[in-house]
Amino acid sequence: MGIRLVRMDQPGAVDTEVIWEYLQSCRARTEDEAAGLGPLEGCHSLDEVRRFGLPEVARQARGDDLPSGFVPALQFAALDPDGKLVGTIQLRLRLTEALLRTGGNIGYSVRPDCRRRGYAGLMLDGCLRRAAALGMRRVLITCSPSNLASRRTILSCGGQLENVLPSRSGQPVERYWIELPTESTGQRTRQHEPV
């Protein structure tokens, strides 16, 4: 099993119908199951994906004229060997105060019917490699204490719990840092099997 991470800001990287179908499959479970989609989270039709979502993904990747509180971010689609969109992951290239507190550098989601197959770990590992290649030294990843699968994924990729803070809504958020390899330290290795 493997995945290929493709940047969603590249024209034609992922078909808009595939993205829309992914959004629908995530939302069929619950309204907030489409985390890790960045600006695509707000799309409620195929037309919105085309006219708003993907252009906004490209704008965030360029860092052009971002609204207050937004940072440059790269959006990736995780495709299995058959080309099925199994997950999405976003790498935020900087942290605002809010992201530093409870948002982090990385957000991800896995298609509901593809969970518990190791995709989240593969996606996070690939995203961490991209972050290191961009010169990032460490990244912050957060999750809810009740999201045991995400916690295991973060730990499997080297996450170290710093603390637990309340979100704006008062819900606890676990904050994990992952140190990234530099040229002198070599490759980071996974500590556990993917979940």
Task: Show which residues each predicted segment covers.
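Conserved GNAT acetyl-CoA-binding A-motif
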Residues: 131-142
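Conserved catalytic-core motifs of GNAT/GCN5-like acyltransferases
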Residues: 142, 155-175
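Charged catalytic carboxylate motif
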Residues: 18, 123, 149
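GNAT-family acyltransferases
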Residues: 1-105, 112, 130, 169-195
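Conserved acetyl-CoA-binding loop-helix of GNAT-fold acetyltransferases
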Residues: 107-110, 116-133, 152-156
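Conserved beta-strand-loop-alpha-helix junction that forms the acyl-donor binding cleft
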Residues: 141-151
